[in-house]
């Protein structure tokens, strides 16, 4: 099978077509301009520097451009980085398209939509069900296309809905174990907790933060959406208030972006399973490219830790 970007080890030479996910201009200590690039294919992404750039390079090697390059995989502060030796823009004659370089969820969109719909169907609280169903219908196209984040976890096409499906399965297991859990509230919280990402983020290709994402953030966005849809549906009362609390508190702490800590059991569960699913996704991503008996590269989103891949099964 043809090797992809993250299949290469430190010290190996790479010659590949890659998609530019981000491109940021900087100035080196010698005063010369350079570009910090994030390059990707279906296996994942790596950072690279393009030195001594000209004005034309900023256009030729901008976001969403496909490039053919040759370079070396290096270790930079515990993480792989690509040192570029040669680079050029892809041409129509190369016969490559952006979709070839974008990682996608391991479950197709139709299957995920069917599974999420089943969880909504099982909800017995009419108000929570109506709010959840209405918001998902309003944003369903983007919900099933968008990543769950710009970097770190589930940062691929349909990553948002895959994250939700994984969390719903965890939520069901927790509710089966603890019968005092309000399944309807927990399921609604899981389905809606990151819905604001469809406004916070620009989309599945070369994802960046929108103006709303930078200034408001997905937590405040989804709480506002719940308020609006509840008013449209003439729903008020405690369910709306508690659902908004569950969504507001799902990051767990103020320093992590939540204005309130979890103060109902479903909010605490949502926070814990969100953290679990995101953490395991990040770990799986690096351990997939780590040989048994070795440590992974450092994972910034997990306190910059390296993880060990055991030799036994």
UniProtKB/Swiss-Prot annotation:
Location of the DNA-binding region in this protein: 22-90
InterPro entries from the UniProt entry: 3'-5'_exoribonuclease_YhaM (IPR020873), HD/PDEase_dom (IPR003607), HD_domain (IPR006674), NA-bd_OB-fold (IPR012340), YhaM_exoribonuc/phosphodiest (IPR050798)
EC number(s) stated in the UniProt entry for this protein: 3.1.-.-
Source taxon at top rank: Bacteria
GO biological process, one term: rRNA 3'-end processing
Pfam families found in the cross-reference section: HD
Domain HD span(s) in chain numbering: 163-279
SUPFAM superfamilies: HD-domain/PDEase-like
Entry GO MF terms: 3'-5'-RNA exonuclease activity; DNA binding
Keyword terms: DNA-binding, Exonuclease, Hydrolase, Nuclease
PANTHER family assigned to the protein according to its UniProt record, in alphabetical order: 3'-5' EXORIBONUCLEASE YHAM (PTHR37294:SF1)
NCBIfam families listed in its UniProt record: PRK13480.1 (NF010007)
Family, similarity comment: Belongs to the YhaM family.
Function of the protein: Shows a 3'-5' exoribonuclease activity.
Name the record gives this protein: 3'-5' exoribonuclease YhaM
